[in-house]
């Protein structure tokens, strides 16, 4: 067992409010494996809460003040309102209430921390980095926002010195972290309410995050992203750049996109070209792999280890996850599930699908996530969703937000219809999708469920339901 940090010796019982989230459950599992007594609450069960309960955590469904009566510290998800009864009770009892990132920072403080930030690609880049280190026998601890298929979990306590984790900019909590290596995959307009709807303030936060890296550490930055390029002149800490353009430190050349894989060579100063086969589709994942290669190069991982890890990478849950292939008429239907919920993510995922299956129709079931995001990026959603062949649009998954007029699923559906490229089908509830799909599917279709909300549950059910009901 890894020793507890000196300050944390005073702590025995740790309670998580909103424990079912990927980031929260991951930290809870690491602390559980370190020997702490972990409890948590959430509004509903999911795979994360069940996994924690199986490993000895005390999980409660629903929030009550009594859940925090005997704990030493309360860790709160950014998705939980500050008026939550458990938070109120903890403060009344003078129990420390901290953010997820504060607890992650404590775990990182006594390890060699690698923090992966960026609007898009954090989970995949963190997973690729952790997989390379594991392949090299470095046994890292990792906390990831999705399930790493090779271990069947989103977190693992390793015995090595490295801790690899996502750094969340959505609530600016990544500013708690003090990593040795920081990665920034991109800087895009999302969660803008945190930054007063000022893109400049968002970029300022990333600069501050990168300045938390010590002078003997390093940053690994994507030079293909305009937001990242904007901040480069402001950085005073060591950094490496990656991308496809000339002049970057870690450069991909000779890119071949081969269906669900990619091949390319990596050029690095003072090193032989590195031939890579990446077991992931999409140009965006080539960039994510370059980031992981940049970290591995900084840590001195052998090239052969990098090659094995990327060629054998088994993917992440809900990141271009192929759930099933079913016989359908004289062809088949392929079911793909992806967490993408921002227009840039949707565009990258759809591009990957078009490249993998250029002659097949894309039937997309999309659930918008948050009314504020739908409002702020409305026209971008209209543009990217108009490119698919068939669109079934669900109502917005609120994530606790109040509805906003003109930013709901029906409004988005109408705007896409007015654009004139496709005629979307609006589904009031996920259950309606089971009735709609059999009437629109054709042999050879690729069904893609996209979004960060409950559409992930629908994605798990579709192959079985349609396999028994929809074959013509």
Curated annotation (Swiss-Prot):
InterPro entries in the cross-refs: Mur-like_cat_sf, Mur_ligase_C, Mur_ligase_C_dom_sf, Mur_ligase_cen, Mur_ligase_N, MurCDEF_pg_biosynth, UDP-N-AcMur_Ala_ligase_MurC
Enzyme Commission code(s) on record: 6.3.2.8
UniProt subcellular location: Cytoplasm
GO BP terms: cell division; cell wall organization; peptidoglycan biosynthetic process; regulation of cell shape
The UniProt record lists the keyword Ubl conjugation: no
This protein's pathway: Cell wall biogenesis; peptidoglycan biosynthesis
Gene Ontology terms for molecular function: ATP binding; UDP-N-acetylmuramate-L-alanine ligase activity
Predominant localisation class: cytoplasm
Record keyword rRNA processing present: no
Gene Ontology cellular-component annotations: cytoplasm
Keywords: ATP-binding, Cell cycle, Cell division, Cell shape, Cell wall biogenesis/degradation, Cytoplasm, Ligase, Nucleotide-binding, Peptidoglycan synthesis
Binding site for ATP: 118-124
Cystine pairs: none
UniProt catalytic activity: UDP-N-acetyl-alpha-D-muramate + L-alanine + ATP = UDP-N-acetyl-alpha-D-muramoyl-L-alanine + ADP + phosphate + H(+)
Family affiliation: Belongs to the MurCDEF family.
Protein's job: Cell wall formation.
Stated name of the protein: UDP-N-acetylmuramate--L-alanine ligase
């Amino acid at each position: 067992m890894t020793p507890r940090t000196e300050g944390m010796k005073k702590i025995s019982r740790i309670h998580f409010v909103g424990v079912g989230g990927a980031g929260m459950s991951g930290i809870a599992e690491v602390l559980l494996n370190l020997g702490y007594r972990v409890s948590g609450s959430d509004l509903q069960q999911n795979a994360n809460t069940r996994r924690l309960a199986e490993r000895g955590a005390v999980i409660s469904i629903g929030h009550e003040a009594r859940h925090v009566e005997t704990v030493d510290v309360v860790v709160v998800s950014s998705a939980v309102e500050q008026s939550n009864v458990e938070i109120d009770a903890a403060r009344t009892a003078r129990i420390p209430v901290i953010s997820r990132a504060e607890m992650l920072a404590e775990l990182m403080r006594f390890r060699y921390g690698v923090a992966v930030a960026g609007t898009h690609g954090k989970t995949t880049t963190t997973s690729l980095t952790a997989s390379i280190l594991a392949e090299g026998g470095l046994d890292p601890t990792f906390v990831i926002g999705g399930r790493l298929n090779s271990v069947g979990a989103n977190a693992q306590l390793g015995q090595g010195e490295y801790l690899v984790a996502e750094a969340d900019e959505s609530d600016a909590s990544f500013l708690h972290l003090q990593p040795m290596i920081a990665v920034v995959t991109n800087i895009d307009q999302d969660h803008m309410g945190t930054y007063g709807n000022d893109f400049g303030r968002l970029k300022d936060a990333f600069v501050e995050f990168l300045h938390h890296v010590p002078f003997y550490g390093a940053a690994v930055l994507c030079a293909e992203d305009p937001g990242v390029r904007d901040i480069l002149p402001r950085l005073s800490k060591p950094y490496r750049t990656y991308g496809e353009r000339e002049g970057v430190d870690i450069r991909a050349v000779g890119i071949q996109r081969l269906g669900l894989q990619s091949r390319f060579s990596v050029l690095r100063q003072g090193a032989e070209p590195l031939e890579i086969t990446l077991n992931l589709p999409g140009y965006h994942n080539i960039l994510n792999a370059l980031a992981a290669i940049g970290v591995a190069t900084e840590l001195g991982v052998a090239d052969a280890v990098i090659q094995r890890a990327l060629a054998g990478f088994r993917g992440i849950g809900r990141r271009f996850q192929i759930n099933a292939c079913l016989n359908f008429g004289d062809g088949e239907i392929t079911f793909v599930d992806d967490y993408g919920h921002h227009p840039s993510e949707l565009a990258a995922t759809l591009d990957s699908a078009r490249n993998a299956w250029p002659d097949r129709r894309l039937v997309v079931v999309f659930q918008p996530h948050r009314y504020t995001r739908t409002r702020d990026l409305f026209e971008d959603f209209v543009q990217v969703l108009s490119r698919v062949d068939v669109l079934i649009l669900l109502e917005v998954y609120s994530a606790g937000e109040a509805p906003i007029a003109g930013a709901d699923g029906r409004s988005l559906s109408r705007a896409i219809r007015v654009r004139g490229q496709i005629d979307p089908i609006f589904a009031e509830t996920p259950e309606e999708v089971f009735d709609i799909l059999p009437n629109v599917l054709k042999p050879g279709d690729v069904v893609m469920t996209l979004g960060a909300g409950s559409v992930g549950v629908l994605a798990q059910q579709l192959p079985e339901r349609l396999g028994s009901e929809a074959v013509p």
